[in-house]
Amino acid sequence: MKITKIEKKKRLYLIELDNDESLYVTEDTIVRFMLSKDKVLDNDQLEDMKHFAQLSYGKNLALYFLSFQQRSNKQVADYLRKHEIEEHIIPDIITQLQEEQWIDDTKLADTYIRQNQLNGDKGPQVLKQKLLQKGIASHDIDPILSQTDFSQLAQKVSQKLFDKYQEKLPPKALKDKITQALLTKGFSYDLAKHSLNHLNFDQDNQEIENLLDKELDKQYRKLSRKYDGYTLKQKLYQALYRKGYNSDDINCKLRNYL
């Protein structure tokens, strides 16, 4: 087969053959196989060229994808599939990228966890789940998590939550709120409870009473639209108790309120 035309098309070259076949190749392919117009290729040379062209094009795609941020092996492979790189070539591309240190799942996991320590608010359980979703294996994640101390981060997150809710909730509800938030963010129960020891939950009676008054007004506006009488009183009691207020304080307020 003879090459009848070579034409540059943006980042690729269009090659046309005298058997009416055409294909796109990278500049690396042109150089490697010393392609030029009127060059004759046998079947083996043509297949070698096609394979290398796919490999070269796929690698260029992957490098473009990696230029924005670190990616896992799986993320790169999925990206190549999306761009219709042949399945049997993808492992070769991944291997080359690994050998040249463009991709490394262990380093990616380490960087992700370190960045979270500096700027994030996630505990180890959520971090692991997010890394698994990126296609990183547990054996690349677990050693890094086990060597990472999350106690200071848990304290930092708990302090931020404390500052946000301390003027809105009584001590018991505030503790529950912070604990549940930390659990949701992936911290262990022990770490969540330990982080509370660094916070001052002391509130004087007047502060608690003011909070109770505000919450009672809020719940009354909401519940009085649907209930009245004894049922309203019960609903108010239940709502306030769930918020963490003392039972005696609630009953006292309700006697004077209704």
From Swiss-Prot:
Keywords: Cytoplasm. GO terms for biological process: regulation of DNA repair. The keyword Cytoplasm applies. It comes from the Bacteria. It is found in: Cytoplasm. Pfam families: RecX_HTH1, RecX_HTH2, RecX_HTH3. GO terms for cellular component: cytoplasm. Belongs to the RecX family. Modulates RecA activity. This is Regulatory protein RecX. It comes from Streptococcus pyogenes serotype M4 (strain MGAS10750).
